Amino acid sequence: CDTESGEEHNRSRDWGDEPTKRQMMRNMFSGLFFAHGTPMIYGGDEWMRTQYGNNNAYYIAADNEWNWFRWGEWQSTSSHFRARMHDFVRNLSRMRKERMYAFSPKEHGQGMPFAWKTQYNTNMSGTDWSGKSTMIHYYNDDNWDKPQILIMMNMERETRTFTLPEGVTWGRILDTQSYFDRGDILDEPEGFFTDNPDFDTATSANITLDTPQIIE
């Protein structure tokens, strides 16, 4: 790490192991791509490029190996993890484009309605906003008839049980916790979830469901 440049007030955390660290990267990417507005990332973020702690790459003395693009890392022992993170981000971009009606409305306040919910599917109150387990529900009203979207976020260090909205058939489309164990897809099909079930969300994971269009 370059200890000579950058300011000292940094907020960082060593997650202790590489799988957890990559999981948190996927959480950050999914939060960014599912937010309103234009996702903006640094070049190389999609394949886990790092500056090894140097947060001041614009400093003239920072023109060194800490900040260069190390293209050879694609051929390193961790190259398969980098390739799969690249695939994850690419698929996130595709998923966002397919749901622009929710994540990127053309006019402010004109997008699909949504509500912040607790893990118990209740409306958020003042004390709930400081919690680490929440849901975002994009739902239909009199003006909308699109596939609904439910984003479950659990940043606790243990599994949390979420209550899904009633009367809706859900299918899982994203699981940040299991991606690297499941190959070059965002998630494997696991059937549909109906009848207001409970859904266990793993430690420090984001799970996204939507209402699939059934073609008869």
Regions found by a protein language model. Name each.
Residues 1-17:
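Alpha-amylase-like alpha-glycosidases and glucanotransferases acting on alpha-linked glucans and related
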Residues 18-22, 26, 31-41, 45-47, ...:
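Carbohydrate-interacting/catalytic domains
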